[in-house]
Amino acid sequence: MAKIKIGINGFGRIGRLVARVALQSDDVELVAVNDPFITTDYMTYMFKYDTVHGQWKHHEVKVKDSKTLLFGEKEVTVFGCRNPEEIPWGETGAEFVVESTGVFTDKDKAAAHLKGGAKKVVISAPSKDAPMFVVGVNEKEYKPDIDIVSNASCTTNCLAPLAKVINDRFGIVEGLMTTVHAITATQKTVDGPSSKDWRGGRAASFNIIPSSTGAAKAVGKVLPALNGKLTGMAFRVPTVDVSVVDLTVRLEKPASYDQIKAAIKEESEGKLKGILGYVEEDLVSTDFQGDNRSSIFDAKAGIALNDNFVKLVSWYDNEWGYSSRVVDLIRHMYNTQ
């Protein structure tokens, strides 16, 4: 069986984890990485040792030369181009490019990869104009003529499957979401300048920081039935990985909390198996580290005020779960061609 050949632009948190997911997949082959800011020996070090996800234990990673990494026997070509138009993806056979720099998130900028020979681009961030797909929710709307897509955000990937189940079964009149979100790379280690978001410039390890998120509104893009019905905000908290969504909704059809739990459990074992999880144990955030599902509903943590108004809680490994979906979306696009 032919493998799906992928390239990664930007070897940061998501880029490296997408590489880990790809290298553990039988049907996906990582053929190239582009990052103008990291040398091959430093790439090897950053890939091998990860504070959150631990040391890479699968096969040896070493530098063959300044343009090639070896993952076991597998050669991966390394480029160092600042301009995405100049990356020769075609030379390596990379059909799908994961755009994970966080810089080229709109359609025009991401399209630069096509000039170098890539066939499709998956942006690992929300995009203002590229179509957004959340696996398990709306990926079936992808058509083979779409060349540039967004995998939305980690929070949208957690929220959308849960919101879909609730809306399909009971109907959502309106809702508010809060994500209690782990630290990410854009935050500061100590107080520093952040002109657009003053609170975001405060020390990440010492503060609970209220922040904005477009995740709830983005659900309206992947689930048009919920457009204008959800909004939300974030609290950035001093943990390094794993976040949790609190979705509070008013229901159209009255339902007891037990009925809601049963519906979510059923979907988690059916159509959304592997995407939506369901737990009844007394778990905490670190218990979900390395969980590759998008959203794990915590049956014990939620609470209903009455049969029309309910708070639902769902966990997600905002790094590993999201990176797993990037690769799943590529698989879906490949199989749809």
UniProtKB/Swiss-Prot annotation:
The active site is at C154 (nucleophile). The record marks H181 as: Activates thiol group during catalysis. NAD(+) binds at R13, I14, D35, R82, N318. S-nitrosylated upon accumulation of NO in plants. It comes from the Eukaryota. One of its GO terms (cellular component) is cytosol. It is found in: Cytoplasm. Its main location: cytoplasm. Belongs to the glyceraldehyde-3-phosphate dehydrogenase family. Plants contain two types of GAPDH: cytosolic forms which participate in glycolysis and chloroplast forms which participate in photosynthesis. All the forms are encoded by distinct genes. This is Glyceraldehyde-3-phosphate dehydrogenase 2, cytosolic. The gene is GAPC2.
